[in-house]
UniProtKB/Swiss-Prot annotation:
The lineage of its organism: Bacteria, Pseudomonadati, Pseudomonadota, Gammaproteobacteria, Enterobacterales. The active site is at residues 176, 248. GO terms for biological process: carbohydrate metabolic process; cell division; cell wall organization; peptidoglycan biosynthetic process; peptidoglycan turnover; regulation of cell shape. It is found in: Cytoplasm. One of its GO terms (molecular function) is beta-N-acetylhexosaminidase activity. InterPro entries: Beta_hexosaminidase_bac, Glyco_hydro_3_AS, Glyco_hydro_3_N, Glyco_hydro_3_N_sf, Glycoside_hydrolase_SF, NagZ_Beta-hexosaminidase. Its EC number is 3.2.1.52. HAMAP family: NagZ (MF_00364). This is Beta-hexosaminidase. It catalyses: Hydrolysis of terminal non-reducing N-acetyl-D-hexosamine residues in N-acetyl-beta-D-hexosaminides.
Length: 340
């Protein structure tokens, strides 16, 4: 399949989108809140996508929990990653983190969605783009919670995506709006932020990784998402990562310094990304499809969900879902009360 992941505009496919999904460069599609009205509509949209595409696409969503959860009505409202470490004991926190990973993945698989881009492995809560999406500022605490979240995802049949390599948590700027710079030296980044990625790669916990649209000027002049140093020299060679590398959305301002959409896509692919995301700009996406060279990335098929076939109603009738839903809803409400 091709190396480009796109989006669609609304609740159902239009004729142009059906044509675009036939393009040999298209290998994936990401869904947003604007694509969701209710469970039945979402199920029909996914069915349309499967029918319209040339081959099976990787269908993705950001269903992390907390403020980043694209589908809410009819699904469990998932607590933010930060909330798990705030519980009175680590055992309860890790158990709930695992159930959150399992429940999130199970609900998405019930809709025939392959992956949620999760978990966030960035450290700390100061960054505007990260905040409560981070499990903890301490690497060991973050590892403990994230490991159990991934364990839950895997048990449901969903692959994990760690983001945002080598770490987005130490900058205040939001890469959706500008290109952040992290001025720390390489040894600090490697020892602190990157330690969770290194550990999880060694233990085969990460199936995919998404690099940050962040520049680390003491290391390389390019954002990590377009840096062959970070993706090839560090991630592939030094850390030995063999999974899928996704770019973050190339329409974000953090990627704008890489040039036009074609230039952004080519830069990210040349740097080592296996699949590039081009969202929220149809003209940019079409330009990339028209001008990028035809390539195939066979390893993307490894990201298809392995959860079997069941409906959302069948899932909700299971005892595990009911218990997990009750506990996670209570934590979600508790966290919302604390945030007010």
């Amino acid at each position: 399949m091709g190396p480009v992941m796109l989006d669609v505009v609304g609740y159902e496919l239009d004729n142009e989108e059906k044509e675009i999904l036939q393009h040999p460069l298209v290998g994936g599609l990401i869904l947003f809140t604007r694509n969701f009205y209710d469970v039945e509509q979402l199920r029909e949209l996914v069915r349309q996508i499967r029918k319209a595409s040339r081959h099976r696409l990787v269908i993705a969503v950001d269903q992390e929990g907390g403020r980043v959860q694209r589908f809410r009505e009819g699904f469990t409202c998932l607590p933010a990653a930060q909330s798990f470490a705030g519980l009175s004991d680590n055992l309860n926190g890790t158990q709930l983190a695992e159930e959150a990973g399992w429940l999130m993945a199970s609900e998405m698989i019930a809709m025939d969605i392959d992956i949620s881009f999760a978990p966030v492995l960035d450290l700390g809560h100061q960054c505007a783009a990260i905040g409560e999406r981070s499990f903890h500022e301490d690497p060991e605490q973050a590892k403990m919670m994230a490991e159990h979240f991934i364990k839950g995802m895997h048990s449901a049949g969903m692959k994990s995506t760690g983001k945002h390599f080598p770490g987005h948590g130490a900058v205040n700027a939001d890469s959706h709006k500008e290109t952040p710079c992290d001025d720390r030296p390489l040894e600090v980044i490697c020892h602190h932020d990157m330690s969770i990625f290194r550990d999880f790669i060694q233990r085969n916990l990460l199936d995919a990784i998404m690099p940050a649209h962040v520049i680390y000027p003491q290391v390389d002049k390019h954002p990590a998402s377009g840096s062959s140093y970070w993706l090839k020299s560090v991630l592939r060679q030094q850390l030995g990562f063999n999974g899928v590398i996704f770019s973050d959305d190339l329409s974000m301002e953090g990627a704008a310094m890489m040039g036009s959409y074609v230039e952004r896509g080519q830069t990210a692919l040349n740097a080592g990304c296996d699949m590039i995301l081009i969202c929220n700009n149809r003209d940019g996406a079409v330009s990339a499809l028209d001008n990028l060279p035809l390539t195939k990335v066979e390893k993307l098929s490894e990201l298809y969900h392995r959860g079997g076939q069941y409906s959302l109603n069948e899932l909700k009738n299971s005892e595990r879902w009911q218990q997990a839903n009750k506990a996670l809803t209570a934590l979600y409400e508790q966290w919302q009360d604390c945030a007010r």
